[in-house]
């Protein structure tokens, strides 16, 4: 059974939804437009989040100091880098924090291994104009040779999640648009998707 991340919480209601459904991780996005929140909102949301759920900060080419501050004040339990952060950046960040770091990769070609200082890779759908949250899946066969634990994102929802897990056995599945209706988190979709995953 994989771990579950519900990403892109924008409203207090979204926090209450994940508190009901009890995924393993809840994601706060600090970049982009559709699901972006500011640091103060993240602090407030973290205070409302169930203690059993770990918070993930999603950053795109942000200042390392900003990430360190959110880790030190315990707003963020895990760091997800979703931009063009290179190994030098990851190394400098890991020298300053003890939290796990996830590096996102937008998949275009077959991936066999990952030489990275990050603790996990996250595989998402490739797009030339956005860093994630596209709602589109990619060719999962491109990951069939990858053997390390990884996070799987990209168009996952209640209709395809069981197939994805059966095919790839990811460490964690990352859901965002797949648990939304008209651009906002949907409690029923979250509960149903978590239930499917917990039964695998």
Curated annotation (Swiss-Prot):
InterPro entries: Aldolase_TIM, PRAI_dom, RibuloseP-bd_barrel, TrpF_fam. Disulfide bonds: none annotated. It catalyses: N-(5-phospho-beta-D-ribosyl)anthranilate = 1-(2-carboxyphenylamino)-1-deoxy-D-ribulose 5-phosphate. Pathway: Amino-acid biosynthesis; L-tryptophan biosynthesis; L-tryptophan from chorismate: step 3/5. It is an enzyme of class 5 (isomerase). The gene is trpF. Keywords: Amino-acid biosynthesis, Aromatic amino acid biosynthesis, Isomerase, Tryptophan biosynthesis. It holds the Pfam family PRAI. Its EC number is 5.3.1.24. One of its GO terms (biological process) is L-tryptophan biosynthetic process. Belongs to the TrpF family. GO terms for molecular function: phosphoribosylanthranilate isomerase activity. This is N-(5'-phosphoribosyl)anthranilate isomerase. It comes from the Bacteria. HAMAP family: PRAI. PANTHER family: N-(5'-PHOSPHORIBOSYL)ANTHRANILATE ISOMERASE.
């Amino acid at each position: 059974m994989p771990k579950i991340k519900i990403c892109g919480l924008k409203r207090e209601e979204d926090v209450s939804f994940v508190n009901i459904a009890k995924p393993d991780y809840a994601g706060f996005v600090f970049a982009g437009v559709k699901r972006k929140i500011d640091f103060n909102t993240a602090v407030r949301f973290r205070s409302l989040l169930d203690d059993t759920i770990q918070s993930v900060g999603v950053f795109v080419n942000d200042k390392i100091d900003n990430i360190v501050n959110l880790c030190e004040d315990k707003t963020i339990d895990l760091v997800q880098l979703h931009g063009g952060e290179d190994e030098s950046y990851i190394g400098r960040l890991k020298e300053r924090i003890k939290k796990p770091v996830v590096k996102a990769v937008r998949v275009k070609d077959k991936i066999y291994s990952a030489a990275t200082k990050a603790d996990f890779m996250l595989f998402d759908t490739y797009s030339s104009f956005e860093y994630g949250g596209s709602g589109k899946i990619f060719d999962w066969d491109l990951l069939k040779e990858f053997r390390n634990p990884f996070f799987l994102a990209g168009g996952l929802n209640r209709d395809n999640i069981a197939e994805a897990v059966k095919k790839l056995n990811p460490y964690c599945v990352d859901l965002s648009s797949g648990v939304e209706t008209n651009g906002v988190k949907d409690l029923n979709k979250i509960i149903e998707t978590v239930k499917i995953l917990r039964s695998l």
